[in-house]
């Protein structure tokens, strides 16, 4: 529930605030290479399932598994974590979710560094309502203000349209 609430806040921010790079918001499809400030990523494939290892979704939900390839293009290691990507659907206040916690297998860790020149593949697993058939995987650039860990400037927002098979 906490992750879903945070996703709602991110969704509200994404829908109301323009990025610092102008009004640019770039939309992509599964298989397209998305180039951000720090790295490139591709959503290679999306599947749905009723269970991921030992994790079962709430009643009425299922899991969307987004397989990604990330490639660092930045001159330094880029810290990554579970909150970097969010899956959003519909237009309501509760229509979004952060990935579930790391369960193992090919899932991307909750925290890791994307080292200069590194290519990493893995998946993010999201809990979504059963009836959702289309969504967007969202990444938004956030730049630290000086030494602050809590003050950010928003950069560009990237969305990848995904179909969630029944």
Language model features with spans:
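Bacterial N-terminal signal peptides that target proteins for export
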Residues: 1-7
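C-terminal motif of bacterial Sec signal peptides marking the signal peptidase cleavage site
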Residues: 15-19
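Bacterial signal peptide processing site
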Residues: 21-23
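Low-complexity, acidic Ser/Thr/Pro/Gly-rich terminal tails and inter-domain linkers that flank the onset
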Residues: 28-60
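Hydrophobic core residues within well-ordered beta-strands of beta-rich domains
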Residues: 39, 64-66, 120
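Short, solvent-exposed beta-strand/turn "edge" segments of beta-rich domains on protein surfaces
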Residues: 47-65, 76-77, 112-115
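The feature marks short-to-medium sequence segments in extracytoplasmic or secretory-pathway proteins
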Residues: 71-120, 145-150, 161-165
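Short, surface-exposed ligand- or partner-binding patches at beta-edge/loop junctions that are enriched
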Residues: 123-150
């Amino acid at each position: 529930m906490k992750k879903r609430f945070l996703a709602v806040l991110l969704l509200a921010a994404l829908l109301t605030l323009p990025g610092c790079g102008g009004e640019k918001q770039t939309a992509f499809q599964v298989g397209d290479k998305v180039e951000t400030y720090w790295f490139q990523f591709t959503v290679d494939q999306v599947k749905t399932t009723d269970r991921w290892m030992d994790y079962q979704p709430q009643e009425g939900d299922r899991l969307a598994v987004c397989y990604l390839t990330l490639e660092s293009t930045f001159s330094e290691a880029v810290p990554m974590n579970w909150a970097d990507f969010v899956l959003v659907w519909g237009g309501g206040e509760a229509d979004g979710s952060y990935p579930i916690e790391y369960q193992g297998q090919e899932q991307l860790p909750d925290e890791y560094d994307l080292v200069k020149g590194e290519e990493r593949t893995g998946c993010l697993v999201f809990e979504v309502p059963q009836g959702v058939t289309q969504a967007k995987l969202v990444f938004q650039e956030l730049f630290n203000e000086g030494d602050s860990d809590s003050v950010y400037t928003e950069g560009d927002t990237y969305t990848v349209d995904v179909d969630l098979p029944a």
